[in-house]
């Protein structure tokens, strides 16, 4: 079985990606298991950051690497927190502080203007200098709640409501969330290529 390194130090993201990749004929290994440390995300776009992470993990391990960069885009905040979603309330990353800052920024925003989306870019590099990385993107439309709901998931999940289901991402069971999420959409685009690829 071939190995694929997941270029992330985010435990919640790793768990989600591993579950979504479970059916593939790959041994999925987190970068931390191979001694790879996080690399600074200095890109100006989600794609650039995902490429930076994948190249770093692949260069250190010599393995193909899968990296994701994602964020929450809130229309009433002109796209914030966006690229800086993980560090919205400052460093180090703190989901509770990020959610509190977001809800505070949205305090006066009426219900009909609370639209938002989770957005993800997933990059697969076969080797560090791969001239044709596979890039897929996905989004998940929703609205920002007025208070946190649910205790599942991670990050902004307690404040992101899927209006079709009437549940926040934190209230959904794993199977439903992994079917609807921005990462699931991006991975679905990538999966048929992974099945056919010679890693």
Curated annotation (Swiss-Prot):
Keyword entries, A-Z: Hydrolase, Magnesium, Metal-binding, Nucleotide metabolism, Nucleotide-binding
An annotated Gene Ontology molecular function: dITP diphosphatase activity
Q: Identify the stretch annotated as signal peptide in this record.
A: none
Q: Name one GO biological process term.
A: nucleotide metabolic process
Which cofactors are named for this entry? Mg(2+)
Write down the superkingdom of origin.
Answer: Bacteria
What catalytic reaction does the record list?
XTP + H2O = XMP + diphosphate + H(+); dITP + H2O = dIMP + diphosphate + H(+); ITP + H2O = IMP + diphosphate + H(+)
- Quote a single Gene Ontology cellular component term: cytosol
Is Magnesium set as a keyword in this record?
yes
CDD domains, alphabetically? Answer: HAM1
Positions of Mg(2+) binding: 69
Q: For substrate, which residues are the binding ones? A: 8-13, 70, 154-157, 177, 182-183
Report the active site residues. 69 (proton acceptor)
Give the cofactor note text.
Answer: Binds 1 Mg(2+) ion per subunit.
How does this protein assemble?
Homodimer.
This chain's function reads: Pyrophosphatase that catalyzes the hydrolysis of nucleoside triphosphates to their monophosphate derivatives, with a high preference for the non-canonical purine nucleotides XTP (xanthosine triphosphate), dITP (deoxyinosine triphosphate) and ITP. Seems to function as a house-cleaning enzyme that removes non-canonical purine nucleotides from the nucleotide pool, thus preventing their incorporation into DNA/RNA and avoiding chromosomal lesions.
Cite the HAMAP family for this sequence.
Answer: Non_canon_purine_NTPase
Protein's name according to its UniProt entry: dITP/XTP pyrophosphatase
In its UniProt entry, the species of origin is given as Xanthomonas axonopodis pv. citri (strain 306)
């Amino acid at each position: 079985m071939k190995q694929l390194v997941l270029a992330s130090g985010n435990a919640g993201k790793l768990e989600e990606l591993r579950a979504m990749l479970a059916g593939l004929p790959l041994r999925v290994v987190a970068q931390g298991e191979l001694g790879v440390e996080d690399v600074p995300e200095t890109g100006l776009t989600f794609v650039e950051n995902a490429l930076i992470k994948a190249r770093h993990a692949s260069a250190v391990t010599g393995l193909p690497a899968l990296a994701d960069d994602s964020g929450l885009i809130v229309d009433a905040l002109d796209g914030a927190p966006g690229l800086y979603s993980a560090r919205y309330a400052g460093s180090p990353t703190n989901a509770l502080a990020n959610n509190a800052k977001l809800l505070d920024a949205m305090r006066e925003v009426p219900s009909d203007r609370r639209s938002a989306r989770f957005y993800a870019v997933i990059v697969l590099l076969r080797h560090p200098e791969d001239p044709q990385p596979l890039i897929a993107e996905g989004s998940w439309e929703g609205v920002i709640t007025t208070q946190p709901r649910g205790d599942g998931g991670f990050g902004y999940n307690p404040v992101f409501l899927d209006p079709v289901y009437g549940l926040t991402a934190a209230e959904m069971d794993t199977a439903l969330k992994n079917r609807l999420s921005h990462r699931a959409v991006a991975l679905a685009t990538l999966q048929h290529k992974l099945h056919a690829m010679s890693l």
